[in-house]
């Protein structure tokens, strides 16, 4: 168990105590509706699964941010997946699935995939930035649609923001991890150590990991600390080369992720 739980502050939505103020309550509900994303499923996937929700799967892999999403696109999704849902935050957006997938790919926004070689694995790319105040609502929406047995979260942060008393620990594009109590897999390489205080995990990745800890769900977060402010090959490859956890540990064939 990592001692880093409690490193972040998570802003849960406040409940109203004044039930007499109906107008203010209505405004609050409208605001919450704007904060929640919407899943638009493909017609074929909806037909296959029927009205069965949440969708059960062995593993949910979340790529939060452009570096993690690009890594999943290159090493995980290329030719081995079908897009099953688009995740949108703008309620005015066109709800046609094919239109959304085409435009979301161009804008590198959020897509939910099902692996064709193992349809028990779901992969969600969340390339666009999710504001801090929306993290809780995104988390609730994700787990209202998907019920995984295990969760793997990939995300990134600037290396300049990592604090350590050991300068040798700060290497170019290094990976650290954080896990819930229920996570028991030894899937990380020997050089992958836990994120230590006073470092923090923020935003959607923190919200998802907190949810998994609360509900005793096995989950691990892999954070790539990158030198570049832009997505580059070195940062993307860090997930593959420096976090050599096995696909078999996530329900896939043997080999490196």
UniProtKB/Swiss-Prot annotation:
Keywords: Chaperone. The keyword Chaperone applies. Pfam families: PAC1. One of its GO terms (molecular function) is proteasome binding. One of its GO terms (biological process) is proteasome core complex assembly. InterPro entries: Proteasome_assmbl_chp_1. GO terms for cellular component: endoplasmic reticulum. The keyword Oxidoreductase does not apply. Belongs to the PSMG1 family. Forms a heterodimer with psmg2. PANTHER family: PROTEASOME ASSEMBLY CHAPERONE 1. Chaperone protein which promotes assembly of the 20S proteasome as part of a heterodimer with psmg2. This is Proteasome assembly chaperone 1. It comes from Nematostella vectensis. The gene is psmg1.
């Amino acid at each position: 168990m990592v001692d880093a739980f409690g490193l972040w502050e998570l802003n849960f939505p406040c409940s109203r105590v004044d039930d007499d103020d109906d107008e203010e309550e209505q405004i609050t509900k409208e605001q919450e509706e704007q904060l929640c994303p919407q899943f638009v499923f493909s017609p074929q996937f909806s037909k296959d699964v029927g009205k069965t929700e949440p969708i059960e799967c062995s593993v949910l892999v979340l790529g939060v941010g452009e570096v993690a999403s690009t890594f999943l696109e290159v090493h995980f999704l290329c030719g081995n997946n079908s897009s099953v849902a688009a995740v949108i935050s703008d309620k005015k957006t066109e709800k046609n699935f094919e239109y959304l997938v085409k435009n979301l790919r161009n804008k590198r926004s959020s897509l939910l995939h099902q692996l064709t070689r193992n349809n028990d694995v779901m992969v969600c790319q969340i390339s666009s930035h999710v504001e801090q105040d929306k993290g809780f609502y995104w988390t609730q929406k994700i787990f209202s649609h998907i019920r995984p047995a295990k969760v793997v979260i990939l995300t990134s942060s600037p290396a300049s923001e990592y604090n350590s008393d050991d300068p040798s620990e700060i290497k170019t594009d290094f990976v650290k991890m954080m896990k819930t109590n229920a996570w028991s897999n030894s899937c990380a390489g020997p050089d992958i150590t836990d994120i230590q205080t006073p470092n923090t995990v923020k935003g959607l990745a923190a919200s998802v990991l907190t949810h998994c800890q609360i509900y005793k769900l096995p989950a691990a977060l892999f954070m790539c600390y990158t030198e570049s402010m832009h997505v580059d090959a070195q940062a993307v490859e860090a997930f593959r080369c420096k976090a050599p956890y096995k696909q078999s540990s996530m329900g896939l064939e043997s080999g490196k992720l």
